[in-house]
Amino acid sequence: MTLSAISHYRGGSIDDVTPLAKTLKAIYLKYGVTYRLSRFQTGPNAGDWFVVVQYANSTAYEKVQTMFAQDPEYQQIITEIAKIAKRINRELVIDLDL
């Protein structure tokens, strides 16, 4: 079963976040990881960011974490994102195949 990391971030305008997200998505794709970015439009979190990063399974998740730790391009983009957006929370979920 696929495994997803679901994160909520606060901060950064669309103009600030979009180029960083595009770079991060390209890095994730290089490792076979799916990346989706959405923006809350209503409610108390309006303007915040919702991120879903999907891995093939838990083994793939563990393997790629080691690779990310050794990838300077990945480390750099994460550092840049942290300058403009704060992660509010992050959860790992098992995706159900319905």
PLM region spans:
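Short S/T/G/P-rich N-terminal loop/turn motif that feeds into the first structured element of a domain
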Residues: M1-Y74, E80-L98
